[in-house]
Amino acid sequence: MTIFIDLASLEDLYNDLISHIETLRKKKGSEYSVADYQILIGEQRTVEFLSKIVSNETEFLFKECKDSDKDIEGFFNVILTILHKLENEDEINIVSQKIRDSLSAHPTENSQLKIKILTNLFNSFQPKSTQRYDIFFALVKLASDSNNLEFVKYQITDIDSWLEDWNVSIQQKRKLYKLISNIFKEKQRMLSHQFLVKYLQTFTKEDSQEAQEDAVRVCIESISLQELYQSDYLLDLPAVQYLEGSTVSANSLTYELMKIFATEQLDSFLQFQQKNPNFLSTIGLSNDDCLQKIRLLSLATLTSEQSKVPYSLISKMLQIDENEVEMWVINAMEGDLLDAKLDQLNRIVNVNSSTQRVFNKSQWSQLGQRFSVWKSSVKNLLQVIENAKTTQVKPFYFQTR
């Protein structure tokens, strides 16, 4: 948090602010009258004074003084100092909003400085201040509109804990998550998908109908994102579950297809295709891309169930020629779906580890069995060590006279 320590009186700050603008106006040959400002100051209408001077002077500063960042930032620093002398929360919010709106009006003009000033405004409030939400939203929007995506990406790393600190409403969460998702929709699709999921997580069974368009979108994304191999988390979202029973045929089919990619195998996908031959293209999916992904997912499932997998079994499951098996295994390894070694002599894939597409009761049972085996192995090893200690030959010494 930025701490403002200013021993000047309000009257001195007002005069400094007006004098600062007056000097800049004269330098640029711009007509300027302080009468309106002085009336507001004289009547102690601080909020109106701050709102008016921010509205009137921001555009001038960024157009006529664009080569003097120091003068512009100095103006807003005085504004912030006065702002934090206000005691009424509503008044603070009015001025804060005026600053946000004025800086966001022309986002592409001197955007870096505007982002810096908004950041100063954000940091001037306590970490748990509710004011921070609206400022942060404006910051993200401004950075997006001015194509400063790396700034946005850097700022959102702690977003969930911040939202908790600010005690925001569900609607505020949705608004921010949706904004961030849309910002990265074209250029960083995985990040966009993650925030779309966060957005949909805020819906319950009662209001899921409101999110149908976005639920369809998240299902399609889970299929089209080639680097996304685990998507069973979508099955737990009420907004996505609502699609299953939708009266809109395309919505229910999208859910069915998403579920195949989340939990099922190649044969289920081929059956779906046979029943709905043109559906993939209608929702913007490539048949070849989908076929490649479902084969990789099917391979992950197969290799998660056994540690030694014959080429012939992989060939049968993926419906490919046996000579293509090694290529598919290598592709799966490059995508971090599995870690394995190819035994070309015996035509077997020796699996070290494989991605679990789902983690349900069956997987917990497998994990429990493995822990039991490890526990037994460790117990036997400890027993061997203990036996070695007790049977160890004790050294003897020759006695000398």
UniProtKB/Swiss-Prot annotation:
Coiled-coil-forming residues are none
What is one cellular component GO term in this UniProt entry?
eukaryotic 43S preinitiation complex
Q: Name one GO molecular function term.
A: translation initiation factor activity
Question: What gene name does this entry carry?
Answer: eif3m
Q: What keywords sit in the KW lines?
A: Cytoplasm, Initiation factor, Protein biosynthesis
Where does the UniProt annotation place the signal sequence?
A: none
Q: Belongs to which family?
A: Belongs to the eIF-3 subunit M family.
GO biological process, any: formation of cytoplasmic translation initiation complex
Q: Does the keyword Protein biosynthesis apply?
A: yes
HAMAP family according to UniProt:
eIF3m
Report the residue ranges that make up the PCI domain in this protein: 188-356
SUPFAM superfamilies in alphabetical order: Winged helix' DNA-binding domain
Purpose of the protein: Component of the eukaryotic translation initiation factor 3 (eIF-3) complex, which is involved in protein synthesis of a specialized repertoire of mRNAs and, together with other initiation factors, stimulates binding of mRNA and methionyl-tRNAi to the 40S ribosome. The eIF-3 complex specifically targets and initiates translation of a subset of mRNAs involved in cell proliferation.
The protein's name in its UniProt record: Eukaryotic translation initiation factor 3 subunit M
Q: Where in the cell is the protein located?
A: Cytoplasm
Residue ranges of the TM segments: none
Q: Which SMART domains match?
A: PINT
Claim: Coiled coil is one of the keywords in the record: no
